[in-house]
């Protein structure tokens, strides 16, 4: 028999269910509200010195919800296919079709895990509301299964257009049969004529840059003009003029997207690949898969004109990493407070082509010990992350090595510094931007916020020298509001005057991101609570206004 309390409980539950159903499904006669804006934030989810323990894909799956809750909207994952060995970071590409599924190069798994774990990681990221970008390495192949005799000529390393020997035969590592995979997924076998050159003659144990001879053999063009022609980078260089190569790479692209359900690409070393290749390849893969496939290319040059040229030659089909901006951060961090902060965006993609700029502070190539080592000093990193995460220009990318640390070099995690800036981007960095880039040390900017994102708006200051203050405009809609420093670097507050201005402060060599203190309802109106030992409803909880945080 039902007790009185249980009858009351069931009655309220029925009423609550009825009201929720009415709210969710009954037409209101009003058009649906547009979704509130949400800033995109990418994370490069690896660094060079990760241990060879096959656990990264599992970590992605385990961390997906946490990362998404902080505002990360996309993960750039490392190359997922088999490299020259199990410990290969992924850029010594052996077999594009082996995602940790076949016993090749001494193991089934890659450095990061198995194919099944990779697919589970992607599914977990999607379930958490994040996209996944795959790292694509088409410049070269390494770890060949055998050698072939090839006619070749030596070229000058500083000017690859200059031949410095006669033609002679070399023994080149260019034979790729994939014995562990066989013909699964693809029966294509790579031979010497699918490549332009190598840097090793096995017969003489000689390291040179060799350009192959034969019908149609020459360095690809157009590529970057560094060293005369920068087609050749390492290993066996793919010949993007060979129709069989182009067809096979297009087939792989379609297979990869359909197999993994990834959402986009990070393209490695695009300055070394024929400029006309990727627009054609992307058009084909996007068409074949029916997915827009966001794409960012790595064109490593601090010369902004080279980046502009590439964007023009590729018709804006992809974004580019803003290497010039990274160089600005690096230089500022090493200048002991003498860098002119007014020039932080000068000659960068962030300024010149913001919609195609992927901004970053550091990456796996700029880490200590790497070929492009240019590690931004730790004191400056919070300033740099504030710059890319709270401004309107560019698509920012957070680096795994900054977020989690790099044990190999005893580099500590900056998670406690980066998290508040991620929250600033997630909740506050919206609306019209006003710049105050008018001082050699202290620069600032504000965002007015948008009505679709209640409580949004901010004021940011960074300085590479002494601390100080700036009067900055955040909008009259914020008049009377109290702003506090989300980073916790300052404990004071700022009250916005009737004209929408406030005097915001920053400590020396530091950053402050000022946001409006929120007033919000802390609980759902008329929520129902129960004692843990009974199923009776015992009280109503009134809504209450609290200052937050």
UniProtKB/Swiss-Prot annotation:
Instruction: Note whether Hydrolase occurs among the keywords.
Output: yes
- Sequence positions that bind Ca(2+) 2: 196, 218, 220, 239
Cofactor(s) essential for the protein: Ca(2+); Na(+)
Q: Does the keyword Metal-binding apply?
A: yes
Q: Which residues form the signal peptide?
A: 1-34
Q: Which residues form the active site?
A: 268 (nucleophile), 298 (proton donor)
Question: How is the cofactor bound, as the UniProt entry phrases it?
Answer: Binds 3 Ca(2+) ions per subunit. Binds 1 sodium ion per subunit.
Please state which protein family the record places this protein in.
Belongs to the glycosyl hydrolase 13 family.
Q: What is this protein called?
A: Alpha-amylase
Its ancestry begins with: Bacteria, Bacillati, Bacillota, Bacilli, Bacillales
